[in-house]
Amino acid sequence: MLTDKQVREVRSRFKIFQRKIYLNTCSQGPLSDAVQAGLEDYIASWHEQGSPWELWAEQYEAARKAFARFIHAEPEEVAIVTSASAGINSIASALDFRERRKVVLGEFEFPTMGHIWLAQRARGADVQFVKADGNRIPAASYEQMIDRETLIVPLTHVCFKNGFRSELGAITRIAHASGALVMLDDYQDCGTRPVDVEAMDLDFYVTGTLKYLLGPPGLAFMYVRRELISSLVPTVTGWFAQANPFAYDAQNIDLSPTARRFEYGSPPVPNVYAAMPGIQLLSELGMENVAAHIRQLTQALLSHVLALGIRAKTPADSAGPLVVLHSTDSNLLLRKLAERDIVASNRHDGLRLAFHVYNTMDDVEAVMEILKANIDLLAPAPATVGSHE
């Protein structure tokens, strides 16, 4: 667990907390002084040296190594891309849909996941969506659809709309028992608790820096299990995917033997500089401590919400950093929060409140004060005791 002193020290690194309560990390992490300094270092190198590509390449590889350590992978298993979409597209382009055609994914996926796999229908993919049961998708529902025709199971760890955490372990075991691959989109969870991709038995893992990794947009990381790399030949590619990008050979493709084969063009160097501080901060705090701190806050909020009879879209037993409440007018409720300098977000009828290392119990109490004053903008909980949508 983080100490009060540690949390205060973390908050002091983010200027926004001088004037606001920030509960929107599910959309974008706030800017820290360390990230700003990283960007200034990049600008200084550009000013002073013009094109110091050797220096920038060192930073690029340092980011790869730092993220690999963060998820307990090897640097050779990590690709650096400009977005989760770019990484997923690269993998999708490398798959062969002739023998196994099915792609099984839940209807809670972020749109980019659905769009990319639906686009593979042109290459023979049979895309099937697992229906939700209320605000959950049980592993048993995946089991009914995954079979020997299934090529890959793309899976979101935490749903962006309701905060539901998927039954990752069970779904992975079901998929692998049928010979299917598993891809985890961890954008809404990475940076909030420990990640060990080997222990999780994942084939692919993708996330980005702009949310709980406390970095900028425009940078994402993708893990590819080492045993798969050489067998996958992406058709979405570019010069930085080559074994030697600086061979400048336009007439031959010679892909890198590492996960770098899933990269595209020139790297987003400013974002690399800005990505490192967040990963470093979280690593220094210890991810077990970070997870315990977040869990304490989300459980406190859910307890208050249930006591008031407010309907939570987020199942209490699967809550991660994101708690979503059912609102009858989420746009108006957001404005009410903004009037009190509380930054949150909404998706359709859901008010999203996201917690991280810099949030406190005082933040929870401040939000609850606004919710109590505007309880008419929140849907009542179902009559069944302890139930959630």
Task: Mark where each language-model region is.
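Pyridoxal 5′-phosphate
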Residues: 1-389
